[in-house]
């Protein structure tokens, strides 16, 4: 068993990191569907989250991932995007259920957080989320 990591962004081609490093984009949100993936991790980054928070394709991607019961992990400013997607999707109390969602406590992306996400991926789906019918996706 193994995992394959893909970078998805609002545009195709490449983007630059905060340090100026080029990052190859594997897919763009307008041309890819969440059904192609088993899980999603939303990392932080103030500038990237500002851009993604105003991108309807990114919001839809997260909501579809959640609605399909797939694992989601978020850290740092990625928590803001996760919350915005939940509100936009019509989640109960404007927040997703914690079932199948890994959150980096105190923004600590450490081995425990990584293992929690790996364990969630191993469980595959979380169809027992109480709010799946409420999510617009």
Label for each model-derived stretch:
Residues 1-137:
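Active-site-adjacent pocket-lining segments in enzyme domains
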């Amino acid at each position: 068993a193994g995992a394959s990591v893909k970078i998805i962004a609002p545009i195709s081609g490449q983007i630059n990191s905060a340090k100026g490093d080029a990052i190859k984009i594997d897919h763009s949100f307008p041309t890819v569907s969440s059904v192609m993936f088993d899980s999603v991790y939303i990392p932080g980054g103030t500038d990237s989250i500002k851009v993604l928070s105003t991108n309807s394709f990114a919001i839809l991607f997260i909501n579809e991932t959640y609605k399909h019961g797939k694992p989601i992990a978020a850290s740092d400013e990625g928590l803001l995007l996760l919350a915005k997607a939940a509100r936009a999707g019509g989640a109960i109390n404007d927040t997703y259920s914690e079932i199948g969602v890994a959150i980096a406590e105190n923004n600590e992306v450490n081995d425990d957080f990584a293992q929690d996400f790996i364990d969630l991926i191993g469980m595959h789906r979380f169809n027992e989320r109480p709010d799946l019918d409420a999510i617009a996706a």
